[in-house]
Amino acid sequence: MVKLVSLLDSLYGYKMIHEGNPDIHSIHMDSREVVEGGLFFCIKGYTVDGHDYAQQAVSNGAVAVVSERPLELSVPVVVVRDSRRAMAQVATKFYGEPTNDLQLIGVTGTNGKTTITHLIEKIMQDQGKMTGLIGTMYTKIGHELKETKNTTPESLVLQRTFADMKKSGVTTAMMEVSSHALQSGRVRGCDFDVAVFSNLTPDHLDYHGTMERYKFAKGLLFAQLGNTYQGKVAVLNADDPASADFAEMTIAQVVTYGIENEADFQAENVRITSTGTTFELAAFEERMELSIHLIGKFSVYNVLAAAAAAYVSGVPLQEIKKSLEEVKGVAGRFETVKHDQPFTVIVDYAHTPDSLENVLKTVGELAKGDVRVVVGCGGDRDKTKRPVMAEIATTFANQAIFTSDNPRSEEPMDILRDMEQGAKGDSYLMIEDRKEAIFKAIELAKEDDIIVIAGKGHETYQQFRDRTIDFDDRIVAQQAIKERWT
């Protein structure tokens, strides 16, 4: 329980209507979840405006409301310029600034965030640390998994989660930090010790508008790093041009990694096979060979980023090497589906042009037969990448099958027609039903072919306008293989 005015001390400026200083027992952004003694934040969403539900929140027990405009209510109304940012600051104080007591590592970038955070988690667990993880796949406190709705949750959920981590004995936490979260201020109040940048390629332009704005949003993580007396570190990809801008934006120590350009963590003599990747790692004064189970040049970048983050967090390089060489993979990331079939099936989360191209190029270098790809694009998301995804699919695969991803409120065939605009040649099919598309790819496969099922990776659902169904690419692929080969 905290007094309202005490919580408001964390805000830079506000106006109070209906003065009062009630006890705050909980904080909410969903009026349906408000209980007696709650503080309700009016948040403007894409389709719903929380200001329209302020009275309902009061009826449910809210004793104060934070809004972006004056409201006629019977409880104190705190008017702020940006209620979402205010919520981040208030939530941080309400939950006792939990990240101040955690070693917090944030990872941002277009691709690779999930893999990098999981690699760091493995290294830290091997050091005997109790870890927490927040990202695309789930929230994890120790070994307990919880479902997440966003890559980076809303600040209210985020700070509550960090408080739960602290209470559970977590000492080190890894978090995927999305550009949406940075732009909207969700991670305000998070005290990052290390911030990692993976790469920057076109994505989310429906939200940010331009690549320059997208880059600026990513850079906010590094701009806010190093604002305290404690030593902070920015881990940047020396092979990505955006890193130069991020280095200028931060006052923290900068450590780099890369393959092509000179870096503090440098991979040399990279050798990729169908079972893994080996390379020589040169890091400061040390040099060693790593042999990892992960496949592809993009995997080397992920490993370098994780190694650098762990190293600046105090883990010796030899122990980092040992942990990384034990990693078998991350769910839905270049994950193979096996059932004694004479061809290879790979499920990958690749849902951006860059990630799809990386996966298909890697597969193309390994394939003895044809490369076939099943791919779609999400509905209600950046439409500009649809023809680009199709162009990449038809350029780097022998055959592409365009199908539904998560259509959401859009008509699936409208999305496929948008994709078709970028297709090269005629070596592609359009099959609206994703299960049917996967079965077709398996049916067409010949010995030594490689099939890539792209876009959904670890996801276990498919979202349509009026329903969400159970759907797992790995399970469907397994069913298709069994039907053909048993």
UniProtKB/Swiss-Prot annotation:
Pathway given for this chain reads: Cell wall biogenesis; peptidoglycan biosynthesis
Keywords from UniProt, A to Z, are:
ATP-binding, Cell cycle, Cell division, Cell shape, Cell wall biogenesis/degradation, Cytoplasm, Ligase, Magnesium, Nucleotide-binding, Peptidoglycan synthesis
List the GO terms this entry assigns under cellular component, sorted alphabetically: cytoplasm
Membrane spanning segments where?
A: none
Q: Locate the N6-carboxylysine modifications and list their residues.
A: K218
Q: What Enzyme Commission number does this protein have?
A: 6.3.2.13
Cofactor(s) recorded in Swiss-Prot or TrEMBL: Mg(2+)
Listed GO biological process terms: cell division; cell wall organization; peptidoglycan biosynthetic process; regulation of cell shape
What residues does ATP bind to?
A: G109, T110, N111, G112, K113, T114, T115
Motif Meso-diaminopimelate recognition motif in this chain: where?
Answer: 405-408
* Catalysis performed (reactions): UDP-N-acetyl-alpha-D-muramoyl-L-alanyl-D-glutamate + meso-2,6-diaminopimelate + ATP = UDP-N-acetyl-alpha-D-muramoyl-L-alanyl-gamma-D-glutamyl-meso-2,6-diaminopimelate + ADP + phosphate + H(+)
Cell cycle: present as a keyword of the record? yes
Q: Which positions in this protein are listed as binding UDP-N-acetyl-alpha-D-muramoyl-L-alanyl-D-glutamate? A: S31, N150, T151, T152, S178, R186
Q: Where in the cell is it found?
A: Cytoplasm
| Keyword presence, DNA-binding | no
- What PTM annotation applies here? Carboxylation is probably crucial for Mg(2+) binding and, consequently, for the gamma-phosphate positioning of ATP.
Where, in this chain's numbering, is meso-2,6-diaminopimelate bound? R381, D405, N406, P407, R408, G455, E459
The record's Gene3D superfamilies line, in alphabetical order, gives: Mur ligase, C-terminal domain (3.90.190.20), Mur-like, catalytic domain (3.40.1190.10), MurE/MurF, N-terminal domain (3.40.1390.10)
Instruction: Tell me one GO molecular function of this protein.
Output: tetrahydrofolylpolyglutamate synthase activity
In terms of InterPro entries, this protein maps to: Folylpolyglutamate_synth_CS, Mur-like_cat_sf, Mur_ligase_C, Mur_ligase_C_dom_sf, Mur_ligase_cen, Mur_ligase_N, MurE/MurF_N, UDP-N-AcMur-Glu-dNH2Pim_ligase
Summarizing the function annotation, the protein's role is: Catalyzes the addition of meso-diaminopimelic acid to the nucleotide precursor UDP-N-acetylmuramoyl-L-alanyl-D-glutamate (UMAG) in the biosynthesis of bacterial cell-wall peptidoglycan.
Q: Which family does it belong to?
A: Belongs to the MurCDEF family. MurE subfamily.
Protein name, entry field: UDP-N-acetylmuramoyl-L-alanyl-D-glutamate--2,6-diaminopimelate ligase
The gene is murE
